[in-house]
Amino acid sequence: MTRRELFTAAGSAALLSPLMEAAPAEAVPNPRGHLGMGGAPAGFGAWNAAHASPGGGRGRGAGSRPFLEGFFDYCHSLGLGVAEAGTPPTNPDDVHRLRDKMASYDMWVIFDVGVPRDEADVERFDAGVKAAKEAGGYGLHAALTQRRYEQFNTLADYQKSFEQNQKSVALAEPILRKYQMRLALENHKGWGAVEQAAWLKRLSSEWVGVHFDFGNNVSFLEDPMFTLETLKPWIFSCHIKDMTVQPYDQGFLLSEVPLGDGFLDLKKMVDTLRAKNPNMPMDLECITREPLQIPIYTDKYWVTFGEMPPRQVAHMMEIIQKNPPKKQVPHTAGLDPAARLKEEEDNNIASIRYARAHLGL
């Protein structure tokens, strides 16, 4: 299937036709099949733009993206072995076609089924998990939060949101157990590693764990290895990425960069996770965008955190000082759609090649 056919099948050829000619994808051979590196939609901005649905998206509970069969095909065309592909299909023909593709491509799929908001929403969640099971999903992913330091103005507001997250997952757990489907909760700039670990320890369910993002908790002044080690007992799956940090007047700028271009010890992190589970899905999420502002010198940043260990803060300041960007970090402001897609694909292909050569992915 060609790149044009992929976009057409996804219903977005008219929107993206100028981009397809400007930035052709380049497949990277995948010798590991479903054990090779996968793809997360946030790292593929053209797909996010083409398939955004009103009220959907990450961090919105029940609002999840519709099934992205085109993205599943696109990941295969790039040499990726796993795809995070929205909500599961329910039409029997679509389910059979997906199962056939998973077998022929030797790929896995991870679905997003929004957790129940309340008791009245459990029936919808049950139907979604059942559909994911019937479609052959490896598991479920959920990102329940936005950026905590931007979203909330008081500690009480954050605590109310966290309580709702815990209630939703508690409602979801019996359904997950019923269908024996695992739900992996992403550390999505909402909870610190210690908070998330304590919650999962209290929940004590083999069906609820972590979708570990390699870089998100840098925004909480956490060393990525600390985050990994703290959450490791519960990690089911991952978003692999590399990060750079650089100072600005209100704190530091945080950017995803191609694998190998940042300060993360990727080999150590991958080896640690492979030792836990040699078959763990690791999905590439190199988001090509403007650097994120982490305003640690403002009162607004700290209002939801309470006390943070001084040594933790000092360690992150040392990382910022000693790890300037190795290359120009991605910037997208002012780029036309074709140039943005070209930069994104270049970054993703570079990351896939690095993962093949240096990480065994």
Predicted regions and their residues:
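Twin-arginine (Tat) signal peptide motif
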Residues: M1-F7
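Histidine-acidic metal/acid-base catalytic patches
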Residues: F7-G11, P18, E26-G55, G70-D73, ...
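Active-site acidic/histidine proton-transfer and metal-coordination neighborhood
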Residues: P18-L19, T90, K101-I110, P116-G209
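Hydrophobic faces of well-ordered beta-strands that scaffold small-molecule active sites
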Residues: L35-F44, A83-A85, V109-V113, L140-A142, ...
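Active-site mouth loops of central-metabolism enzymes
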Residues: A40-P66, D112-V122, Q159
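Short, acidic/polar
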Residues: G57-Y74, D121-K130, F220-T227
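Catalytic domains of carbohydrate-active enzymes, especially glycoside hydrolases
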Residues: P66-P89, G136
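Acidic-and-aromatic substrate-binding clefts and catalytic sites of carbohydrate-active enzymes
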Residues: A85-V95, V115-E123, E150, N187-V194, ...
